[in-house]
Swiss-Prot record:
Any one GO cellular component localisation term in the record: external side of plasma membrane
Extracellular topological intervals: 47-260
GO biological process: B cell differentiation; B cell proliferation; CD40 signaling pathway; inflammatory response; integrin-mediated signaling pathway; isotype switching; negative regulation of apoptotic process; platelet activation
Descriptive protein name: CD40 ligand
Keywords for the protein's UniProt record, in alphabetical order: Cell membrane, Cytokine, Disulfide bond, Glycoprotein, Membrane, Secreted, Signal-anchor, Transmembrane, Transmembrane helix
Processing after translation: The soluble form derives from the membrane form by proteolytic processing.
Primary gene name: Cd40lg
Membrane topology value: Single-pass type II membrane protein
Positions of transmembrane segments: 23-46
Organism: Mus musculus (Mouse)
Length: 260
């Protein structure tokens, strides 16, 4: 009789954790994360609560101080004269500090506003007779003249030069005698010219007026004015065709500009 023997198959080794262990680890992880979040929230709450309590304590101390100060002024309570004097001194120092801080803030704000504002730039000059009878009119700082800032200057008595760029209102008024010979038909022309810091001169405004045939001096005025953007170092001047006809009395002929 032949007996057969079969060797039992080896037991399979478990490669993963049991299901109960996985559930335990998952719950432990959730618990730790929840505890960390709760700790952070509690710390934030505690910090804010402590700040609020500290503020309330300070307010309470201020209230007690003011209440004691009132008692000192009324002569009530058991506070000694020395304590009252000390409290009054502290209160006066506090008021003085608050007043000084307000004044410093006002001064700083005023200085900042002054620094932000553009300085006023304005000029107004009157005509002056020129023996050379040149076509470019001469001007002078006399009579009712204005030279508001050192950022504008009258150069060579002929042109106004600005040292800061910006928009300017430039104007001129020229009064002249309109009597001419009947045979001459040439009008009296006034031109407002720009001389940039670099480049050639160019005309900004021009106006013309006809002459009369009268032998008497019939006064006529030409007014020019406009807004122009001038660069730093630019100059403006006035040119006429007959400088000998210009009237130079006060108030008749003038020239100026104003920064907008």
């Amino acid at each position: 009789m032949i007996e057969t023997y079969s060797q039992p198959s080896p037991r399979s080794v478990a490669t993963g954790l049991p299901a109960s262990m996985k559930i335990f680890m998952y719950l432990l992880t959730v618990f730790l994360i929840t505890q960390m979040i709760g700790s952070v929230l509690f710390a934030v709450y505690l910090h804010r609560r402590l700040d609020k309590v500290e503020e309330e304590v300070n307010l309470h101390e201020d209230f007690v101080f003011i209440k004691k100060l009132k008692r000192c002024n009324k002569g009530e309570g058991s506070l000694s004269l020395l304590n009252c004097e000390e409290m009054r001194r502290q209160f006066e120092d506090l008021v003085k500090d608050i007043t000084l801080n307000k004044e410093e803030k006002k001064e700083n704000s005023f200085e900042m506003q002054r620094g932000d504002e553009d300085p006023q730039i304005a000029a107004h000059v009157v005509s002056e007779a020129n023996s050379n009878a040149a076509s470019v009119l001469q001007w002078a700082k006399k009579g009712y003249y204005t030279m508001k800032s050192n950022l504008v200057m009258l150069e060579n008595g002929k042109q106004l030069t600005v040292k800061r760029e910006g928009l300017y209102y430039v104007y001129t008024q020229v009064t002249f005698c309109s009597n001419r010979e009947p045979s001459s038909q040439r009008p009296f022309i006034v031109g407002l010219w720009l001389k940039p810091s670099s480049g050639s001169e160019r005309i900004l405004l021009k106006a013309a007026n006809t002459h009369s045939s009268s032998q008497l001096c019939e006064q006529q005025s030409v007014h020019l004015g406009g807004v122009f953007e001038l660069q730093a170092g630019a100059s403006v001047f006035v040119n006429v065709t007959e400088a000998s006809q210009v009237i130079h009395r006060v108030g008749f002929s003038s020239f100026g500009l104003l920064k907008l």
